[in-house]
Design a protein with these regions (language model features):
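Glycine-rich, aromatic-flanked loop segments that form ligand/cofactor-binding clefts
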Residues: 1-18, 42-62, 82-109
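Active-site-adjacent structural elements in enzyme catalytic domains
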Residues: 1, 32-48, 250-253, 257, ...
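Preference for extracellular/luminal or secreted protein segments
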Residues: 14, 173-174, 183, 204-469
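Surface-exposed, active-site-proximal loop segments in enzymatic domains
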Residues: 16-28, 64-75, 114-120
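Active-site-proximal loop/turn and secondary-structure-junction residues that shape catalytic pockets
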Residues: 8-10, 59-60, 106-108, 152-154, ...
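Second-shell residues forming the walls of enzyme active-site clefts
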Residues: 77-226, 230-236, 240-250, 254
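Structural recognition of the beta-strand scaffold that forms the well-ordered cores
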Residues: 2-6, 10-12, 52-57, 99-104, ...
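Glycine-rich anion/phosphate-binding loops
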Residues: 28-44, 79-83, 127-132
Length: 469
């Protein structure tokens, strides 16, 4: 029987399925009960498609606000909170016959670089690693997580073996996968690699095939996106005695045990389990509740909120978000939906993308023309690739916001939670939503209008030393 695997961060991302907010929203809602419902909901919708294994959740910690890949994909920078919420999310998945995967061992979120582009480093000392990432992985192993995905990340305090003078990533490190993870940490589940196409993995050997074989030898049981030649090559090298049969036996035992654990060996198993109307309603309610409980008021020092049609009728909404890879303008299009939500609620809205330097004369008058100027900042991972800071036109919008009368300015981040203190520390009203989707927009409007209270608590330290001078 086959394992069918998907990524499915933020819910099952297909039409007709239920979108969930980013993982950090779960951290802001800070409810183990909702974490379980999140996992269960994703599992039920996965089962309706025949999916029995997800590469989720992210178990990395946001220790470096400049990390471009973890950010809102992670629940927190706090290991205790991460263990509490992730263990329930995993339980929700696995109680409902979907294998969970935690990633990216030995832990991302320390480096300021992206393992899609290069091999990155978890530079923590042994003591610090055991207090942070090591603790999260160790505790979730004890809780019974089925799979672990190593990242293309090094762990210098532990590693000694080198390839061409450099420490290899975990996906190529026998020390980290077999020595640390399988033996010292007693992980008996399946090790599934991160994508073989990422630059953090490629280029360590003369060709991709040799790297893939080396990854299997290091302790990866299932490779994500290897070449077609990979399996035949492993078979031939086992027959020649170049790869120990014990390595294959270990991988087979782990994969077989996972299939048995999740019922794939049961002859009466349901390949596809439809979601009932009652379950669908519960799933939608879970996503809605997480979203409503996550939106976080970081500060409202001059009491601009709640908004009302009496005092805030005329609004300028400024969309601050870059064009993503190959012209993908998803975040901007979603912000247009948020504009429509304001209009539906009776506001007179002008909407524009960024305020540029050449508009300086116009921007000086903006706070006289409008009751409020709201900067909607959507800076999310890989939209586009690169650091999560603001550049070019978006940076000019920061210039504009900080040049305006702050009594009229509100900043809302629909992505990275660090934007407010990084760029807008003098803006007195600042909100984090963690996600940029229709459900978040709807909840945000109700909260801005005072129909719902702010309930979210920041799951990460916003007063990070990087932003304190």
């Amino acid at each position: 029987p086959l394992l069918f695997q998907q990524d499915y961060e933020s819910g099952v991302g297909l039409q007709g399925m239920t979108p969930f907010p980013k993982e950090m929203a779960l951290g802001a809602a800070n409810s183990p009960e909702l974490a379980y419902k999140y996992g269960k909901s994703v599992a039920l919708e996965c089962r309706s498609l025949g999916i029995n294994w997800v590469l989720h959740p992210v178990a990395d910690l946001n220790m470096n606000p400049l990390n471009p890949i973890v950010n809102t994909r992670s629940v927190s920078d706090n290991p205790e909170k991460a263990v509490c919420l992730l263990s329930e999310q995993i339980k929700g998945l696995q109680d409902n016959s979907v294998a969970a995967t935690i990633k990216h061992f030995p832990g991302d979120g320390v480096d300021y670089r992206d393992q899609h582009l290069m091999t990155t480093v978890n530079s923590l000392s042994e003591e610090m690693w055991k207090q942070y990432h090591g603790k999260v992985f160790a505790e979730l192993i004890k809780k019974g997580v089925a799979c672990i995905m190593p990242g293309h990340i090094t762990l210098p305090f532990y590693q000694k073996e080198r390839i061409n003078g450099y420490l290899p990533p975990a996906t190529l490190s026998h020390e980290l996968l077999t020595g640390l993870l399988k033996k010292e940490m007693h992980f008996n589940g399946v090790v599934v690699s991160d994508a073989m196409t990422m630059a953090g993995f490629r280029g360590w050997y003369k060709n991709d095939l040799e790297g893939q074989v080396a990854s299997f030898l290091a302790g990866v049981d299932i490779l994500l996106w290897p070449s077609y030649e990979y399996m035949d090559t492993v078979e031939v090298r086992i027959q020649r005695g170049e790869i120990p049969m014990e390595r294959l036996d270990d991988a087979v035992r782990r994969v077989w045990a996972m299939k048995e654990r999740f019922g794939l060996l049961n002859k009466n198993r349901e390949l596809i389990r439809p979601v009932s109307a009652e379950e669908k309603a519960e799933i939608r309610e879970a996503a809605k509740e997480i979203t409503e409980r996550s939106i976080t008021l970081v500060r409202d020092e001059d009491h601009k909120l709640p908004l009302s049609l009496e005092k805030d009728k005329k609004l300028l909404l400024v969309a601050v978000t870059p064009v993503a890879h190959k012209g993908n303008d998803r975040d901007f299009k979603r912000l247009q939906n948020l504009r429509d939500e304001f209009v539906k609620n009776g506001f007179e809205v002008d909407f524009r993308r960024n305020i540029l330097y050449e508009d300086q004369g116009w921007q000086d008058n903006a706070t006289e023309v409008y009751d409020k100027v709201i900067f909607l900042v959507a800076r999310n991972t890989h939209t586009p690739f690169g650091p999560l800071q603001l550049w070019d036109d978006e940076a000019q919008s920061v210039w504009a916001a900080n040049s305006m009368d702050k009594s009229k300015v509100i900043v809302i981040s629909l992505g990275s939670p660090y934007i407010g203190n990084e760029y807008f520390e003098r803006v007195k009203t600042y909100i984090n939503t963690y996600s940029n989707d229709a459900s978040t927009h709807s909840a945000l409007l109700r909260i801005l209008l005072g129909q719902l209270p702010f309930k979210g608590k920041s799951p990460v330290n916003l007063e990070h030393k990087l932003f304190t001078f």
